[in-house]
Amino acid sequence: YALISKKYIYIFLENPKLSKKIVSLFSKKVEILSFLELETKLKKLNIKGEKILKDIKYISKYYHDIIRKSYKKLIYEDDPILNFKAIKNNIEIRNMVKAHILDGVALTKFIYWFKNFNAVITELDIVNKIDALRSQNKNFLCKSFPTIAGSGKNGAIVHYIPNKITNRKLNKNDILLLDSGGQYKLGTTDVTRTLSIGKPEENHTVSYTQVLKSHIKLSNAIFPEGISGAYLDYLARSKLWEIGKDYAHGTGHGVGYCLNVHEGPFSISKNSNIALKEGMVFSNEPGYYIENKFGIRIENLVTIKKKILNKKDFFKIETLTLAPYDVDLITKSLLTNEELIWIKNYHNTVFKKISPYLDKNEKSWLFKEINKL
């Protein structure tokens, strides 16, 4: 916890003993205390009749009761700081664009390696490789979450994280669901690509293309002010609902700026009722899963931009993530001409932004890959 007054900042930790190096980073007005001292500090705030705002969703009953007994003027509202974080300013958006170029380079290099690797490979090999490629960048701080690398039946487990016990060798004609991301000095990334080995089965390519159509549907969304994430969730799912398919997770979540990769207060899900605003960043990640068979998910991070239509304010989606889709998994006949054009334009942007940072072989491969369609 942190308690901030006009004069001091108190940080409460389970273990308040920090190294001298960390303590030296703080101002003299920052005091490190034990969790056990939080109750005492709350009771001695001496706010003198000021009102206290509490967000009941994010406070434990224990501390709620302490504050309620100590202070009479309480207001129950949503935490306004959550909206400050959710709506990125222009500098944060510009930096996140740069972070996604760095991340896109690492992921594209990984995909090239994965597609051209001929030896036996395991899920943990994949985790180690993508983590190593990201860490080569001087702006990289750490992973934004544990890497999800599920092959075959493990891909059907939405948040599967391989370990020494579950680690699986990839077989010929498997598909891999790779969901990973990084924390950079310029922002946070989160991206999923589903990749094939060898010649994919028809069920793989058809399902992948159907998920891609949902992904594109959301990417092209245009909507007026006041619309919540529930509407965008419906837009994405509608392409799968038309063919009797669905997925048992939200279509997207808010993403922080060098903060939590899952950030509120809004989401792109069936029950989200918070109005979307310009500058919000969230994931676009529809999927399809068959238990004990395979999993498919395609994820880009996107942001909301203003668009004037008929002299009125509307919003559009701008994609931040830069990494190629697996063209080997696309059934071209299932795509409309507009969807094909969208993929082509996206891949052209990927090549323009990413290819300057690739070596000769990687660049040649990427050019051929995106032009297969």
For every predicted segment, state its role.
Residues 1-373:
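Active-site neighborhoods and metal-handling regions in enzymes and metal-associated proteins
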